[in-house]
Swiss-Prot record:
Gene3D superfamilies: Ribosomal protein S7 domain (1.10.455.10). GO terms for biological process: translation. Pfam families: Ribosomal_S7 (PF00177). Keywords: Ribonucleoprotein, Ribosomal protein, RNA-binding, rRNA-binding, tRNA-binding. The keyword RNA-binding applies. This is Small ribosomal subunit protein uS7. One of the primary rRNA binding proteins, it binds directly to 16S rRNA where it nucleates assembly of the head domain of the 30S subunit. Is located at the subunit interface close to the decoding center, probably blocks exit of the E-site tRNA. Part of the 30S ribosomal subunit. Contacts proteins S9 and S11. PANTHER family: RIBOSOMAL PROTEIN S7 (PTHR11205). InterPro entries: Ribosomal_uS7 (IPR000235), Ribosomal_uS7_bac/org-type (IPR005717), Ribosomal_uS7_CS (IPR020606), Ribosomal_uS7_dom (IPR023798), Ribosomal_uS7_dom_sf (IPR036823). It comes from Synechococcus sp. (strain WH7803).
Length: 156
């Protein structure tokens, strides 16, 4: 283990355009090769598409989508006497949100569509309606934890 002190966690500042912390976190996940302005443009285009299609507030829809994709439990591998068990553990709120954003971005990239903004908008709208790949991934994670409930006493 490292002998240094743990790094101080920096606070996430709200996005300048949408005044939202989750938007800042999503821009960081969308960004490739340090191109932040491109990631911000993709997000603003996706939000404008969502606004056109739904007629509602895209920020509210985005927050609903993240909430619907956030897992509450996950399984972690734990070695006990030569056997590896999948131990279900509760997910801290920060980690759950980070996982949800990661899944939303990765499944957006995997979607068929023209631009990344359109793919992201589609995935966010699906997640807000409790459909889409990110929500399905969350359900799979919960099912896996439920199936391995017998190993919950190995929690560390």
């Amino acid at each position: 283990m490292s002998r240094r002190n743990a790094a101080v966690k920096r606070p996430v500042l709200p996005d300048p355009q949408f005044n939202n912390r989750l938007a800042t976190m999503l821009v960081a996940r969308l960004m490739k090769h340090g191109k932040k302005s491109t990631a911000q443009r993709i997000l603003s285009d996706a939000f404008s598409l969502i606004g056109e299609r739904t007629g509602g507030d895209p920020i509210e829809l985005f927050e609903t989508a993240v909430k619907n994709a956030t897992p509450l439990v996950e399984v972690r591998a734990r070695r006990v006497g030569g056997a590896t068990y999948q131990v279900p553990m509760e997910v801290r709120q920060e980690r759950g949100t980070a996982m949800a954003l990661r899944w939303l971005v990765s499944f957006s990239r995997a979607r068929n569509g023209r631009s990344m903004a359109q793919k992201l908008a589609g995935e966010l709208m699906d997640a807000a309606n409790e459909a889409g790949s990110a929500v399905r991934k969350r359900e799979e994670t919960h099912k896996m934890a439920e199936a391995n409930k017998a190993f919950a006493h190995y929690r560390y």
